[in-house]
A protein has these predicted regions:
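Charge-dense, helix-prone N-terminal extensions
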Residues: 1, 26, 31, 72-73, ...
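A detector for short, charged/polar N-terminal pre-domain segments
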Residues: 1-19
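Polyanion-binding surface elements
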Residues: 15-33
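Short, well-ordered coil↔helix boundary/capping segments
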Residues: 19, 40, 66-70
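A short, structured beta-strand/loop element
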Residues: 31-61
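Long, intrinsically disordered, low-complexity Ser/Thr/Pro-rich regulatory/activation regions
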Residues: 54-87
Length: 87
């Protein structure tokens, strides 16, 4: 099983992960071809350059703790499902 598959299974597993890190999120999204762009301060935007019709996924990178909050995990899951990255 590849790293992307393990991260995807973990993200979409039940119950949702409470310790999914920012670096794991970036790694998973890069596996789908989604790039990260830094904004002001801790703001980050994720976009797919091969699919301009897909809107940006806007996120706030937490600090100093880089663990995603529950609502962030749900937002990522909804984004990936809505735009066909995950079935």
């Amino acid at each position: 099983m590849s790293k992307k598959q393990k991260l995807r299974d973990r993200l979409f597993g039940s119950p949702p992960p409470r310790d999914f890190s920012w670096s794991q999120l970036v790694s998973l999204l890069h596996g789908y071809g989604i790039n990260e762009k830094s904004g002001d301060g801790s703001r980050r935007r994720f976009y797919d350059p091969s699919k301009p019709e897909v809107p940006f996924l806007h996120m706030h990178k937490r600090h100093p703790d880089d663990t995603l909050l529950a609502y962030q995990v749900e937002n990522v899951k909804a984004f990936l499902k809505e735009w066909g990255y995950h079935k």
